[in-house]
A protein has these predicted regions:
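A cross-kingdom marker for long, charged
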Residues: 151-210
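Structured, acidic catalytic/metal-binding patches in enzyme active sites
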Residues: 1-157
Length: 210
């Protein structure tokens, strides 16, 4: 898996201007305590993911990086000896995340993320609040407000995956009770899982806080 995170014939220095490289390098050293001298061969989207997780940890005063929600519930399910099924493999997930965009495009988005850090932090706070409140309309509005993905990228990263998952869920859910954990952006919009489950005839209701 680590091999798939690395660039073969490029470096971050080749993908960025000298000024942008220096800016990103300084920010990564400040936030992640390591710069592009160590991360420079890693695909920009992977660097961006690691950077975002560190920012999330800092603004929420977490002592360690948060565990992904799907991984957290997977561990709980296995501990309770429940059957766990992946809607896609880790390799498939990593391939989509790291190889769906050209490396230059990934680098440009990383530079933009660093340059617009304050805006990104504010958006992350609002998104977190909306998620905890179960406000799907707010989540969708916030995403549309600052959505850097092109239509083609959204199709690959969100829509196609949702279509694949809904086919699997339609086969599983009529026969057994299922708990489904996905990223919040896979829930909302016309192609979101909630809307598609309703179209398939399922009743979808929010779970009240216990």
């Amino acid at each position: 898996m680590m091999k798939g995170m690395m660039m073969k014939d490029s470096t971050e220095k080749q993908l960025m201007s000298e000024a942008d490289y220096a800016l990103v390098d300084a920010e990564l050293k400040d936030v992640m305590k390591m710069g592009l001298n160590k991360l420079g061969k890693m695909k920009p989207m992977m660097v961006s993911t690691m950077y975002s997780m560190m920012i999330y940890s800092k603004i929420n005063n977490l002592k360690k990086q948060p565990e992904a929600v799907d991984i957290l519930f997977q561990k709980k399910a296995l501990k309770q000896k429940k059957n766990v099924i992946g809607l896609e493999t880790i390799d498939q997930q990593m391939d989509i995340m790291l190889n769906s965009m050209p490396l230059k495009r990934q680098a440009d988005l990383l530079v933009k993320e660093v340059k617009e850090k304050e805006k990104g932090v504010e958006l992350l706070k609002k998104m977190n609040e909306a998620y905890l409140a179960g406000d799907l309309q707010k989540i969708e509005a916030l995403n549309n407000e600052d959505d850097d993905m092109t239509a083609d990228e959204k199709k690959i990263m969100i829509d196609n995956r949702n279509a694949n998952w809904i086919n699997q869920l339609n086969a599983l859910m009529p026969t057994k009770s299922c708990f489904i954990a996905v990223g919040c952006m896979h829930l909302v919009g016309d192609t979101g899982l909630i809307g598609q489950l309703k179209k398939s005839g399922f009743t979808v209701e929010a779970v009240k806080n216990l």
